[in-house]
Amino acid sequence: ALGLLVPFFMYSFAMVLFGFALLGIGNTIVQVSANPLLVDVVPGNRASSFLSFSQFIKAVGSMLGAPLAGFFAAKFGDWKLLFLVFGIVSILAVLWLGTSKITETRVEGYKATFGSSFKLLGNNFVLLMVLSIFVVVGVDVGFNSNSGQFLIKQFGIEQTAAESGRSVYFFGRMLGTFAGAIMLTRISSRSFFMWTSILGILCLAAILLVKSGAVAWILIFFIGLAIANIWPLVFSIAVEKHPLQNNEISGLMMMAISGGAVIPLLIGWISDMSNISWGM
């Protein structure tokens, strides 16, 4: 909430950067604590479904940002009112959560620490799950940020149209989280994880080989659809296997989203050294 209110009341380049920093810190803390909290309040066999639905709600909130900014600019002459509205909503959410009674899973005499978190990386299964998040977040950010340039250079699509590839990808992701929330009530997390991973890998490979721009658009949509549920699936599968370490696992997986900063740099470097197809 502070990250949104600071740039609203003190709008300057420095304050916007400060607000971004606060938003990043706050968002990380919320996700580290909210994921295991959600697992505590939903039926055990529905954790993946509700985690996917939470990603859908998050996507809807992200999508509302641009049209709301346009509305406030047209109606009140100040798009920055968006900061105030989102800040107030954040405060209300904190108050609502603070007054809700939730019975958290606790183990007597056990406390999660930095040491206990990093010690879990010695477990091959947990390490593999954390690396999965590192890679999939990197692919998510890298593909989303480079899809426009890929369409321009690979298929000669006009820039304005090509840059809307991000919207196609985002729509696929949003639809994927909603569909995943429904399907995961009927399909096991492990089976869904296997098939959605296979779909994502096949579509990523296919988009490098196709010669048609129209087919590439379709594949971009399906890549978003496939990647959409990887995060909630990996988290729920890991917590299902190690339920007493859900806080540590949540922290490790939030640390693994650094893949979103590392892998896009690698994609850019390879693209500069050869071409964007090799980078992708």
Language model feature labels by segment:
Residues F53-I102:
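Helix-loop-helix hairpin linking two adjacent transmembrane segments in secondary transporters
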Residues G19-F56:
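Cytoplasmic helix-loop-helix junction between adjacent transmembrane helices
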Residues G176-S188, S271:
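Helix-to-loop junctions at the C-terminal end of transmembrane segments
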Residues I29-V42, A228-P243:
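Intracellular juxtamembrane helix-capping segments at the cytosolic ends
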Residues R190-V234:
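C-terminal transmembrane helical hairpin of 12-TM major facilitator-type secondary transporters
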Residues R46-P67, M254-I263:
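Glycine-rich segments within core transmembrane alpha-helices of 12-TM secondary carriers
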